[in-house]
């Protein structure tokens, strides 16, 4: 939401096809009428016929509800995973059995991005594309996480399982492109009773520093442990019971509190960090130095 408050036009694409969920932030899960087609449909169709002419208005959903979009905000769009029904699983299975991997999969994702940008160009264009993906080990996750983006935001916790996944993701990010993407790490859902102790912060930062020094930073250019704004420098998003379950922004009874929680300083800091990587000076960004 902070990007929208910065008057940026944002496109979200759900590529976590094993557990697509971005659409459930904006529509009830059982309301299929609001979603026509999504990422799974695009990949299946383009894989069968790379020259297929696609009407992107069937894929791109303008999110315009006044319950979560104010009149002075940028524009928000969504390409969902697809309609979440039994047919979705069949489409996903077909993709998995069509030898859709490696460079072919990467080419289809690049074409999806191009088609989205072309479709929205006449409506003011897109400033940021946010791609939701799990940092897994299959081709789709590896391509979306490491080979396509200018930057990657990694969400994790201080646990063995989380650190193992983060380490693999950081290693992949550092070696998949000639110019490695920038990285931001987030300690998600941390703290107790709304507070994150200095000990907890220090422990997470130390482990993050170890992983980035070993797998991401060049040997001759390694920042200090407490260097601010570097890849290993965590953003701490406190645990919120309100955000721990479903986040139904379409629910008029809950949206005010949800928007309040999503306006917490940590989310602003994350947005400012992203914008600064692209040389932008966010409105209100001076707060970082206060």
Predicted regions and their residues:
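Conserved catalytic-core segment of NTP-binding enzymes
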Residues: 5-6, 11, 108-223
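C-terminal lobe/tail of nucleotide-utilizing enzymes
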Residues: 175-290
């Amino acid at each position: 939401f902070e990007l929208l408050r910065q008057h940026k036009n944002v496109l979200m694409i759900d590529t976590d096809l094993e557990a697509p969920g971005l659409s459930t932030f904006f529509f009830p899960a059982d309301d299929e009428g609001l979603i026509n087609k999504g990422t799974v449909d695009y990949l299946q169709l383009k894989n069968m016929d790379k020259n297929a002419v696609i009407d992107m208005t069937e894929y791109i959903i303008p999110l315009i509800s006044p319950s979560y979009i104010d009149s002075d905000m940028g524009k928000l769009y969504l390409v969902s995973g697809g309609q979440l029904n039994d047919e979705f699983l069949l489409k996903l299975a077909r993709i998995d059995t069509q030898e859709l991997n490696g460079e072919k999969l990467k080419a289809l994702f690049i074409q999806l991005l191009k088609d989205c940008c072309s479709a929205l160009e006449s409506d003011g264009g897109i400033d940021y594309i946010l791609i939701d993906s799990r940092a897994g080990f299959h081709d789709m996750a590896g391509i979306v996480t490491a080979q396509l983006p200018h930057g990657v935001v990694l969400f994790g916790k201080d646990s063995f399982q989380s650190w193992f996944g983060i380490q693999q993701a950081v290693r992949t990010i550092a070696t998949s492109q000639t110019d490695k993407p920038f990285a931001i790490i987030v300690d998600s859902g941390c703290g107790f009773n709304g507070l994150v102790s200095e000990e907890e912060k220090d422990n997470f930062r130390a482990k993050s520093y170890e992983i980035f020094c070993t797998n991401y930073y060049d040997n001759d250019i390694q920042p200090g442990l407490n260097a601010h704004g570097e890849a290993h420098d965590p953003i701490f998003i406190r645990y919120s019971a309100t955000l721990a379950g479903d986040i139904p922004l379409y629910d008029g009874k809950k949206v005010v509190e949800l928007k309040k929680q999503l306006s917490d300083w940590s989310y602003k800091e994350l947005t400012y960090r992203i914008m600064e990587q692209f040389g932008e000076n966010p409105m209100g960004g001076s707060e970082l130095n206060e």
